């Protein structure tokens, strides 16, 4: 029978519930269990697809095209699984589904209420995740903080699941904070005690408490928490700030967290073999070289907006024994006069995805600098579109060339709407989303990176390269090295007379893994290291 683990949070948000859940998932997978994982977000948006990155951080896209929470990126990178649309559920999705059923008459004229209709829908999303993946263990992270009004239906639903399927099949893990008061010189357990009290008042008794802390937690403090929270002392797990995220699974294993989980859920699996993971962490901690990459974006104040890009750069660096330092460059501040000052000290330039016109001209200036100065360049999504526009303007001389998204009246729409998007009015969920094939041209940097004729990558865009400009740009040295299998949609572009200038319409960062870097990122970092060594 499938086992269910629920991870909740208390005291404050951003405690690392997602990393805790992902780390536990890795440990259980290495015990030979089939693990899947999902995130429940209590906000009323249907998904984060139309939310500002300042509000939510990165939108992570799954193979099947779901626009999801950035925690799913952590889940995929840690557990090395590909998640799906059932892996991220919001209040908006739950209510939308219930209201559609009510309109279809599925409730037989009954009064639709939070209990049982909303809670039943939530429970069905939990069970469906296990069914769709045939999982041995389903880990579900409940977003937000215990005590939030928005979280109540989710907490009630997971409380009911224990009654539905039995205590041996359900486990509750509560993540809290033990703050350190510098003035008093001591750590305080009271916020955790009150958070657990709040959770218990809702009918949920945690089986494990994971305490986030800056300082070591003494045995006396663990005993105190165990007493007041009514759990075993060994089930108080310390989650101290780590030098690398990838060390967290090893820390949890040292404290026998995965064994406690298996004992409670009656899972008789051998201990997790973390030999390869330990080697990875040792490598990360002992990188001997450095390279600096400029990330020119519009959301650089909130680095979570580009979290998968940064992780993909780091993964690529690991394979070259190199620590990749990211220099954050606000695209709005980049001009032709200061671009040398802002990116001249870097070994490679990356322009990531984005929407809207803010910061676009600064990105184009940075791209021109990379092209003219032979600096390795990687463009992603909007970065690929702007690389095409920069070439059209400054090499072909098409003054005013632009994207019809940025300037609908441009005389040269190098980037235009996909034909199927012309009459779409809704913004949410209507992009070209998910995994699509890309055919690579031989003897190109893209082909050399992948070493395969056809690859599959994840997309999230509405606009595409306008094919009427392909002949002229090809004549001028612009290479269309990746297209859709029918050749209609441009997927990857690069330059003939440049050591490494590649840009992709898709989002390669989404499939990178710490032990298996994404090929374009791998080759980009290699080119950046070569550039540094040649200076």
Curated annotation (Swiss-Prot):
Residues 1-267 are annotated as: Amidoligase domain. One of its GO terms (cellular component) is cytosol. L-glutamine binds at residues 54, 354, 382-385, 405, 462. It holds the Pfam family GATase. The keyword rRNA-binding does not apply. It comes from the Bacteria. InterPro entries: Class_I_gatase-like (IPR029062), CTP_synthase (IPR004468), CTP_synthase_N (IPR017456), GATASE (IPR017926), GATase1_CTP_Synthase (IPR033828), P-loop_NTPase (IPR027417). Pathway: Pyrimidine metabolism; CTP biosynthesis via de novo pathway; CTP from UDP: step 2/2. The active site is at 381 (nucleophile), 507, 509. Residues 292-534 form the Glutamine amidotransferase type-1 domain. Catalyzes the ATP-dependent amination of UTP to CTP with either L-glutamine or ammonia as the source of nitrogen. Regulates intracellular CTP levels through interactions with the four ribonucleotide triphosphates. CTPSs have evolved a hybrid strategy for distinguishing between UTP and CTP. The overlapping regions of the product feedback inhibitory and substrate sites recognize a common feature in both compounds, the triphosphate moiety. To differentiate isosteric substrate and product pyrimidine rings, an additional pocket far from the expected kinase/ligase catalytic site, specifically recognizes the cytosine and ribose portions of the product inhibitor. Belongs to the CTP synthase family. NCBIfam families: PRK05380.1 (NF003792), PyrG (TIGR00337). This is CTP synthase. It comes from Bacillus cereus (strain AH187).
